[in-house]
Amino acid sequence: MQNSPIPSPWQFIKENIPLLMVALVLALLLRFFVAEPRYIPSDSMLPTLEQGDRLVVEKVSYHFHPPQVGDIIVFHPPELLQVQGYDLGQAFIKRVIALPGQTVEVNNGIVYRDGQPLQEEYILEPPQYNLPAVRVPDGQVFVMGDNRNNSNDSHVWGFLPQQNIIGHALFRFFPASRWGQLGSFTFVPARTIINT
């Protein structure tokens, strides 16, 4: 029995160039059109997302339906932030609070949507600012960070054009101790307590 020589790494690559090219093209297509990894650089989404978390952001679903209230989205900065020096290629991550046609107001530490107070169990602390009622225009959304008092979001720079949305943050893959699906939060209006 005769042993065939072990091919060198260069010979292996040369023989498998077509396969490697197909794999590279598929990887690039997945990254640009289907899903991509993202790194969380700030604390604006505490306690939901921590600085250093790594997420999978899917890019397909919003081509078929608009974002929903409660979705955590990744997006390019709106025009006002670009004027202030943020690069168009930079990415932000926030939670969708209101959709086109809905109103948003912040008063005495409570966020209201369409006049109803929201019960937001996922926020770090109640907002320490007020925002007069504003109606979200067509083609835009209102977004806020879960760390209400440390977030550069719609309460500062206004509405986010839906065309700026990169995708929906679905899954945290790092760190392993916080591994899992992010999902969307279903907003429940706060109960009104009537003293009798």
From Swiss-Prot:
GO terms for molecular function: serine-type endopeptidase activity. Its main location: membrane. Its EC number is 3.4.21.89. Residues 1-16 are cytoplasmic. It is a single-pass type II membrane protein. Keywords: Cell membrane, Hydrolase, Membrane, Protease, Transmembrane, Transmembrane helix. Gene3D superfamilies: Umud Fragment, subunit A (2.10.109.10). Pfam families: Peptidase_S26. It is found in: Cell membrane. One of its GO terms (cellular component) is plasma membrane. It comes from the Bacteria. InterPro entries: LexA/Signal_pep-like_sf, Pept_S26A_signal_pept_1, Pept_S26A_signal_pept_1_CS, Pept_S26A_signal_pept_1_Lys-AS, Pept_S26A_signal_pept_1_Ser-AS, Peptidase_S26. Residues 36-196 are periplasmic. The chain crosses the membrane at residues 17-35. The active site is at 44, 94. It catalyses: Cleavage of hydrophobic, N-terminal signal or leader sequences from secreted and periplasmic proteins. One of its GO terms (biological process) is signal peptide processing. Belongs to the peptidase S26 family. This is Probable signal peptidase I-1. It comes from Synechocystis sp. (strain ATCC 27184 / PCC 6803 / Kazusa).
